[in-house]
Amino acid sequence: MAIAPRGPGRTPEARVEWALKFRLLDLSKLSERARHRAWAMLVAWERGRPAEGPRPARDKVPEAQQALRQVIEALANGLPDVVWMPETTWSIWPARRRRPGARRGGRVTMTTDHTSPGGIPVTPEAIVVAFVNDLNAVEADRLRACPLKTNGTTCGAIFLAARRQIYCTARHAQAAAWLRYQPKRKEKRP
């Protein structure tokens, strides 16, 4: 997956889908530009506004990816996950007033005490909190792991279900239906 130039998306569902793809990304194969873009997207998702300044040498993108991977896999399999949040001071700024005739007003802005000139590292724990907030906004029970078992192994692909979707793809749903049908068919044979 290449890092999308526009970012994780504007809607919570788009950001959750982006996180599902980002957790599988091989960061060692990214170019410097793509790595910077990944850092900028994670900072924007974490803080609710675009990143300013240069990317630090230790950007914590791999740690954020690992934290996302752990929470996604735990929640999709129905398990709890623990996230330790380091002490950080957050400043919360009120939204700007709506201009006359504008449809939308400003957003509440949150800033942290990471104001070093070398750039802002990503806080993996805050990324997990942002992911969970977006997941709750799109109905958290939609995050699932595919239960199809073939030859004793479970598929386990993690996906965001649409409506009553149980399996990750239509092909897996057909395979599961066929597996349920086969024993009945064998019993009817004389």
Features from the language model and the residues they span:
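Short helix-coil boundary/hinge micro-motifs
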Residues: 1-160, 189-190
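Cysteine-rich micro-motifs
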Residues: 161-176
